[in-house]
Amino acid sequence: MFSNWNIFLNYKNFTINQEIKNKLNLYYQILIEENQKYNLTRITELNEVFEKHFLDSLLFVEQFQIIDQKIADIGTGAGFPGIVLKIFFPNIKLTLIESNNKKVNFLKYLVQKLNLNDVEILNKRAEELNEYKEQFDIVISRAVAYLNIILELGVQLVKVNGMFILLKGPKAYQEIKDLKNKDQKMNLKLINIQELEDTGFGTRINLFYKKINHTNNLYPRKYQQILKESK
């Protein structure tokens, strides 16, 4: 059982109570029990999971308030950051997007065990979700792909005036440079950069893009085409 709850008290815009603590402990227990079956994470030590996965999933909330928005998490894997957000902000409407079948099975089991409501799990690739075009207030992704790839994969899902939030590491500035204004072509505007330095989880650079107009029908292209251009 985790006990160092003080690590969650140094940040604004989210609070922690006993119900949240219980769910996070259960989340950890399920994650470790199922990890060998599903290959979910290389980080398994208790304190590391709570800091490098759970807390790291929340750091962007310092800069952007979460209340009851409709949120899509692209490439959620073991549920980071989406499930963590749902535990702390139960009023959000959450869609988890994951193309790996085994991880989808884990997510379904996890959502059931945590007794989470208003969670949709899609076993698809983000660029294939044409029926979800401009449906989400927030699209978020944590360490899934290079910036010029992930922006194109997910841009169609974001509402006009909605946010595309990317949880990144120390290479984020180089990735921004490599975009070569591709974000502007997709009607995305970088409105905020959050920099965090901590010995526990290293350098974190979170990017906040606002969608300022509808997505051009050119985007997203087929994944292999996006990938080929990015090389």
Curated annotation (Swiss-Prot):
<comment type="function">
    <text>Specifically methylates the N7 position of a guanine in 16S rRNA.</text>
</comment>
<feature type="binding site">
    <location>
        <position position="75"/>
    </location>
    <ligand>
        <name>S-adenosyl-L-methionine</name>
    </ligand>
</feature>
<keyword id="KW-0963">Cytoplasm</keyword>
<comment type="similarity">
    <text>Belongs to the methyltransferase superfamily. RNA methyltransferase RsmG family.</text>
</comment>
<dbReference type="GO" id="GO:0005829">
    <property type="term" value="C:cytosol"/>
</dbReference>
<dbReference type="GO" id="GO:0070043">
    <property type="term" value="F:rRNA (guanine-N7-)-methyltransferase activity"/>
</dbReference>
<dbReference type="Pfam" id="PF02527">
    <property type="entry name" value="GidB"/>
</dbReference>
<keyword id="KW-0698">rRNA processing</keyword>
<dbReference type="InterPro" id="IPR003682">
    <property type="entry name" value="rRNA_ssu_MeTfrase_G"/>
</dbReference>
<dbReference type="InterPro" id="IPR029063">
    <property type="entry name" value="SAM-dependent_MTases_sf"/>
</dbReference>
<feature type="binding site">
    <location>
        <position position="80"/>
    </location>
    <ligand>
        <name>S-adenosyl-L-methionine</name>
    </ligand>
</feature>
<feature type="binding site">
    <location>
        <begin position="126"/>
        <end position="127"/>
    </location>
    <ligand>
        <name>S-adenosyl-L-methionine</name>
    </ligand>
</feature>
<keyword id="KW-0489">Methyltransferase</keyword>
<keyword id="KW-0949">S-adenosyl-L-methionine</keyword>
<keyword id="KW-0808">Transferase</keyword>
<feature type="binding site">
    <location>
        <position position="142"/>
    </location>
    <ligand>
        <name>S-adenosyl-L-methionine</name>
    </ligand>
</feature>
<protein>
    <recommendedName>
        <fullName>Ribosomal RNA small subunit methyltransferase G</fullName>
        <ecNumber>2.1.1.-</ecNumber>
    </recommendedName>
</protein>
